[in-house]
């Protein structure tokens, strides 16, 4: 009879701990995956955007740097 309250208390103490650790692992994985995706998107998008802006500014200032000629 004494084991039942002890078991219930231990169950209540242990059960909230499991979802938090799983939740934390999932959040860490999502953060890492998001950073990896962000790095790939940033490199391609940012560098090509910079090259396009630099090319358009160069073509406006001096037409000898344009690749269209």
Curated annotation (Swiss-Prot):
Q: Spell out the subcellular localization from the entry.
A: Secreted
- Select a single GO molecular function from the record's annotations and give it: toxin activity
What are the protein's UniProt keywords?
Answer: Disulfide bond, Secreted, Signal, Toxin
Superkingdom of this protein's organism: Eukaryota
The entry's comment on post-translational modification says:
Contains 2 disulfide bonds that can be either 'C1-C3, C2-C4' or 'C1-C4, C2-C3', since these disulfide connectivities have been observed for conotoxins with cysteine framework V (for examples, see AC P0DQQ7 and AC P81755).
Q: Which residues are processed away as propeptide to yield the mature protein?
A: 20-54
Quick one: signal sequence residues?
A: 1-19
Organ and tissue specificity: Expressed by the venom duct.
A GO cellular component entry from the record: extracellular region
**Domain notes from UniProt:** The cysteine framework is V (CC-CC).
Q: What family classification does the UniProt entry report for this protein? A: Belongs to the conotoxin T superfamily.
Q: What is this protein called?
A: Conotoxin Lt5.7
Please name the taxonomic classification of the source: Eukaryota, Metazoa, Spiralia, Lophotrochozoa, Mollusca
């Amino acid at each position: 009879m004494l084991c039942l309250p002890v078991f219930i208390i231990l169950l209540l103490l242990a059960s909230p701990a499991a979802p938090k650790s799983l939740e934390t692992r999932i959040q860490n994985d999502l953060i890492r995956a998001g950073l990896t995706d962000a790095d790939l998107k940033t490199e391609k998008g940012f560098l090509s955007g910079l090259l396009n802006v630099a090319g358009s500014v160069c073509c406006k200032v001096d037409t000898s740097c344009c690749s269209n000629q």
